Amino acid sequence: MKNGFGKTLSLGIQHVLAMYAGAIVVPLIVGKAMGLTVEQLTYLVSIDIFMCGVATLLQVLSNRFFGIGLPVVLGCTFTAVSPIIAIGAEYGVSAVYGSIIASGILVILISFFFGKLASFFPPVVTGSVVTIIGITLMPVAMNNMAGGEGSADFGELSNLVLAFVVLSIIVLLYRFSKGFIKSISILIGILIGTFIAYFMGKVQFDNVSDAAAVQMIQPFYFGMPSFHAAPIITMSIVAIVSLVESTGVYFALGDLTNRRLTEKDLSKGYRAEGLAVLLGGIFNAFPYTAFSQNVGLVQLTGIKKNAVIVVTGIILMAFGLFPKIAAFTTIIPSAVLGGAMVAMFGMVIAYGIKMLSRIDFAKQENLLIVACSVGLGLGVTVVPDIFKQLPSALTLLTTNGIVAGSITAVILNIVYNVFSRAEKTERNADAIEQKTAV
């Protein structure tokens, strides 16, 4: 049965709502951490929403060069939050976008053969990395629950009550609602929390009234990018981790749509993601990855048509052209965001643990990979000054929990699993050769 335009439009809006909270939280966290003005923050949210639409269309409108052609929605990756904040603090905003541009180019280059590197990123690595991502983001959530780091009312009871009300709403909706309402429970929690905060005197609409009605998208809004080795390496690691995450989403959607993905399909998907990251750097947005929450919505609705996602991409681009829509997101109090972040980042941790559950922990090597990578990732997050005496080129790699933990997981996997398999294969070949000789 064919979908009418009205139904396709409504389904497209559902996908926008399902990913909207995750899409706006990243620019809000990053923008506030880097001390952007209200005008700059409004632009950052606007361009991010716009580029989410562009990135989505690059993937769904498949051609011979790029695009996986599945009903996939792309959004800014949470993996990049901590590294972007660290790069911005150490090198400035120009280096942030220089590193994003460089990582986008890297993804495009490795897209031709990344599928062959899967042995370097098994579940023991990806599960550890995703778990570390959630853990290292949790301090951001806790600071926001208290009112925002450095705020005059940090830790006040009103902020904590507001944050826990939002968290409670999300938990209750997850428990008692079904279908689409359940899929947008975080967005509903943020909206209700902001409504309550208004009556507590914590919401001001000046930013909305001051915002322009329409805004043209422009490249290099924050100035020309600069390129430094350490930020580029850091963001390249983030991009590769995002590719691994996206691969899981691609295969999940392939199963849902009864489509067997080939290596060529994956390469085109990676290439589209690389283009999205490159454009994100040029237009001062973010790195992009496939959003898993929209996979759940495809499963819930049973509608697997690419036309729905095309509509989603167009809606996102349209939203990005109207700053007043973005300005509404800047009025959300930090405590409200903090309550929602606990749920979102906690879900990231839970998803990482779920990925780790598929591992054979009877092998001591896997236990050690998880132990060392998660341990170092958490340790560096709690004590960021531990590697302060190292050269400045290395500190960005060692003082970020996500990067430190990811590098540890990849190296240990190579040592314990990749090399050991190669040695085992070589021994078997020698044994066969000896038997043949006899």
Where are these regions (language model features)?
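Hydrophobic, membrane-embedded alpha-helices of multi-pass small-molecule transporters
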Residues: G6-M19, G155-L167, I184-S185, M200, ...
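Membrane helical hairpin/interfacial module
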Residues: E39, I47, L57-K116
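The first (N-terminal) embedded transmembrane alpha-helix
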Residues: G12-I29, V73-A80
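Intrinsically disordered, low-complexity non-transmembrane regions of multi-pass membrane transporters
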Residues: M1-L11, F205-F220, D255-R259, G269, ...
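Membrane-embedded helical hairpins/re-entrant loop segments and their flanking transmembrane helices
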Residues: F5, G31-G67, S236-N306, A429-E433
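C-terminal ends of transmembrane helices
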Residues: N3, V54-F65, L106-S119, S168-K178, ...
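Membrane-embedded alpha-helical modules
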Residues: I87-Q204, G313, A318-E426
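Short, non-helical or kinked segments that cap or interrupt transmembrane helices
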Residues: Y43, F65-F78, S119-S128, I181-L187, ...
